């Protein structure tokens, strides 16, 4: 197994890389199997944190507003990671959001990775749950604040080392780097007609928002318009 990698975890506003956004990135640089450096940031999405996500992560709107723009966050992660392979628990999920954000901001991201979830499925098939929290409990790894990016990235690194120590000799093929793939669909920008209608709706219904309308995609604008019409009604 590689002894130098970056363990990463992200928190997001939902489950869809296309529709939802990065809320937090946490990363841990590992060299010779030991933590060398850590990096992390909250991200200001410009949108309120959904109640379910706020309850799950503990990330509030005040915390979100203290974060950096997504461009700065993605650039910071790419600089921290360099060209090292990644590691994480269900890493394809994290990679999909990172790749989507990178492409949106005109950056590139390709990676090989070790997925502790995939490794656990090969080495611990009898376990009823292979969630990060369940595996941390099994190996007595302190999980820190669950569903916070930095702590989950650290937990994934420690779990990877535990799995390697126990199963590296028995199941070496489980610890081979795998290429990560995620295809980003082309997003059309918001139309001038949508901009005008959305601004009119916000003004008419006296809705305050942190969202930058100019940066929205066509599909994002459509969803926001539909949501306002459903919750507040048409302009009379």
Tell where the protein language model's regions lie, with residue ranges.
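A short, structured active-site edge motif that brings together acidic residues
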Residues: 111-123
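Acidic two-metal-ion nuclease catalytic site recognized across multiple nuclease folds
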Residues: 159-236
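Conserved non-catalytic scaffold segment of RNase H-like nuclease domains
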Residues: 1-111, 125-147, 173
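Acidic, divalent-metal-coordinating active-site segment for phosphoryl/phosphodiester hydrolysis
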Residues: 148-161
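Short, glycine/acidic-enriched loop or turn micro-motifs at the edges of active sites
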Residues: 12-14, 118, 155
């Amino acid at each position: 197994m590689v002894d130098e990698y970056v363990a990463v975890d992200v928190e997001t506003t939902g489950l869809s890389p296309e529709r939802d956004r990065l809320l937090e990135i946490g990363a841990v640089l590992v060299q010779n199997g030991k933590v060398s450096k850590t990096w992390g940031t909250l991200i200001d999405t410009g949108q309120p944190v959904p109640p379910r996500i706020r309850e799950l992560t503990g990330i509030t709107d005040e915390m979100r507003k203290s974060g950096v723009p997504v461009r700065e966050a993605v650039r910071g992660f790419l600089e921290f990671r360099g060209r090292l392979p990644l590691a994480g628990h269900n890493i394809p999920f994290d990679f999909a959001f990172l790749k989507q954000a990178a492409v949106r901001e005109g950056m590139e991201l390709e990676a090989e990775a070790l997925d502790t979830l995939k490794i656990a499925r090969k080495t611990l098939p009898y376990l009823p749950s292979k969630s990060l929290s369940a595996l941390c409990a099994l190996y007595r790894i302190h999980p820190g604040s669950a569903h916070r990016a930095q702590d989950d990235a650290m937990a994934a690194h420690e779990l990877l080392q535990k799995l390697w120590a126990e199963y590296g000799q028995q199941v070496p093929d489980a610890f081979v780097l795998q290429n990560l793939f995620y295809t980003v669909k082309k997003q059309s920008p918001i139309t001038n007609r949508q901009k005008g209608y959305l601004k009119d709706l916000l003004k008419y219904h006296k809705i305050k928002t942190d969202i930058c309308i100019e940066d929205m995609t066509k599909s994002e604008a459509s969803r926001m318009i539909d949501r306002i019409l459903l919750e507040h009604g048409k302009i009379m």
